[in-house]
Amino acid sequence: MSKQIPFLLDTTSEIPKFRAETFWTKEPETIHWINRNLNESTDIGLLIDVGANIGIYSLYAATVNNSISVFSVEPVPDTFRELNANIELNMKTNQISTFMVALSYESGSGTLKNVDPRLGSSGAQIQIVASGDNASTKVLSGDRLLKDEWEKRDHGKKVMIKIDTDGNELDVLNGFIEAFKDGSIVTVLVETHPNNRNEIESFFRSLDFHEDESYLSVEGHSNYRREAKGNGERTKVYVCPMV
């Protein structure tokens, strides 16, 4: 019998059911990253879950540490509705804030491409377009999100970011450049791809962040499963110089 997940989830649809059943085994490094960084003595006050989907990692983080805040970012409307339903199901609306926007290197408008109609699916990507050109999706930079929704809370807590946007990760990172430079962000878990991995590495190196390779020893790390299947995606964890 599989280990029960520590939060409630609507599993009436196929993909959410799969996500619940594979929660502990699909990306154990993400669970380890959350556990390590959200211990009782943490100085982290906010997790930004970029590409939150139906909210499994947002909910897990909020369960591990009920004093932190979570920003769940999900631009696909049907998935966003399911995300909110799951948060309400767990009575976490005071802890988890949701945003039906896409994050990128600048604020504006865009269109979603490659949207799979199945609830809880992944793969959608944002394409920034001129306002009015069928631009149905709001786009924000991470710095704008933080300025509008986090800085007004007037505290010095640090930020951790999880990014899984199926190829747009570098654009998302560039949108947080001010927060990186002012020391707000202390660790990032990011899914990388063959076409952006070197640029992401260069981005972090320019900020004196380094990859924490200790996560590669987590049993069942998704990188090894992906490699065995010929999948080019790799999850990496980067930390600031002080960590």
What residue spans do the PLM features occupy?
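Short internal loop-to-helix segment that lines adenine-nucleotide cofactor pockets
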Residues: 21-48, 95, 109-111, 125-183, ...
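S-adenosyl-L-methionine
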Residues: 1-95, 150-153, 216-243
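Short helix-capping segments at alpha-helix termini
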Residues: 66, 88-94, 180-185, 207-209
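Hydrophobic pocket-lining residues within nucleotide cofactor-binding pockets
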Residues: 101-105, 165, 192
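Core alpha/beta nucleotide-donor-binding catalytic domains of modification enzymes
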Residues: 84, 88-91, 96-117
